[in-house]
């Protein structure tokens, strides 16, 4: 840490982390580091002849940290589990095998991040603002690759994910007389999430309706876009041919995304993103002498939710009111 006249600030850190998680692959230890700098502009002479801005600091940082979070204690060691059986003579012998394949180079996941922003206090420190732009890229992700054609899954360092966006916090604190005080605060954070690379461009990790694919947000929802409802037989006849299955009036009409005049598996696409556009929060505090009251509120906006529990014809719970607007004849929906 270096501080020159409370005006120019520099800091740097270095750490060498070790984890027995990667002992078997010889990657127990790895190096991680970070750098940061700040400039307190209100310490400069050209900021002295004003009384609006009490404090203004420009700041920036860059660094890399490691992660060993793989979802299990010792991921480099496979567990022997039952794996089919075979007949030898008159005997049936139970088979055993590893529950996963381990990459011989399995090691630390690396998180590279940088950010720039500033801290500003105004009006005798009553108003405080702190906007920041951040960019974080996770490389060598510890990824469980699902097995293909009956093979066991594998654990590898593969893939790259980027998260970037803005963070803003603001607050106002003041007093009313000698006994009363109050404060208002708000924060906002945006996120742009994208998978930059995976095993290859055409590779997908599938979990129910969610997918992880190169070029898309992580865990996006994958399926058919719905354009409406087939109203009658003529509507079916003059619409793209549905090769997914037979349809009748009242069935959902899917979009012909690839434009080939047919509804096929290739028309499935991204239909939703579970990552919110932004998160937000508010807080209000009120004080009188030695008593304090604080209210915190928070929420998210812009994320889609995949819900299919209303699709069953044998409902275990009450149906949602949307069922009242179901299709029940030509032109009703």
Label for each model-derived stretch:
Residues 19-20, 138-139, 272-274, 302-304:
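A short local loop/turn or secondary-structure capping micro-motif enriched for an aromatic residue
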Residues 19, 246-249, 300-333:
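Extracytoplasmic gating/loop element in the C-terminal half of outer-membrane beta-barrel translocons
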């Amino acid at each position: 840490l270096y501080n020159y006249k409370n005006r120019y600030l520099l800091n740097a850190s270095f750490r060498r982390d070790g984890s027995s998680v990667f002992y078997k692959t010889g990657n127990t230890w790895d190096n991680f580091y970070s750098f940061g700098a700040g400039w307190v502009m209100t310490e400069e002479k050209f900021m002295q002849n004003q009384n609006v801005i009490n404090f203004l600091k420009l700041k920036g940082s860059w660094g890399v940290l490691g992660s060993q979070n793989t979802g299990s204690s010792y991921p480099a060691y496979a567990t022997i589990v039952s794996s089919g059986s075979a007949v030898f003579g008159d005997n049936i012998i139970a088979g055993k095998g590893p529950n996963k394949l381990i990459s011989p180079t399995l090691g630390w996941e690396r998180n590279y991040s940088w950010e720039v922003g500033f801290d500003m206090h105004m009006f005798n420190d009553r108003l405080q603002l702190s906007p920041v732009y951040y960019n974080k890229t996770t490389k060598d992700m510890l990824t469980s690759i699902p097995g293909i054609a009956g093979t066991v899954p594998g654990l590898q360092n593969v893939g790259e994910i980027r998260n970037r966006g803005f963070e803003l916090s603001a607050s106002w604190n003041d007093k009313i007389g000698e006994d009363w005080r109050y404060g208002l605060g708000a924060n906002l954070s945006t996120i742009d999430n994208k998978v930059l690379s995976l095993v290859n461009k055409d590779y997908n990790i599938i979990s129910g309706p969610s997918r992880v694919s190169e070029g898309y947000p992580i865990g996006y929802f994958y399926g058919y876009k719905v354009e409406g409802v087939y109203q009658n037989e003529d509507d079916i006849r003059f619409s793209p041919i549905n090769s997914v299955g037979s349809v009748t009036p009242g069935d959902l009409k899917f979009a012909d995304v690839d434009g080939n005049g047919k509804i096929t598996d290739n028309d499935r696409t991204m239909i939703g993103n579970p990552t919110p556009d932004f998160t937000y929060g508010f807080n209000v505090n009120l004080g009188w002498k030695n008593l304090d009251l604080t209210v915190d509120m928070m929420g998210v906006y812009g994320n889609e939710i995949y819900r299919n529990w209303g699709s069953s014809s044998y409902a275990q719970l009450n149906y949602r009111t949307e069922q009242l607007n179901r299709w029940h004849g030509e032109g009703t929906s």
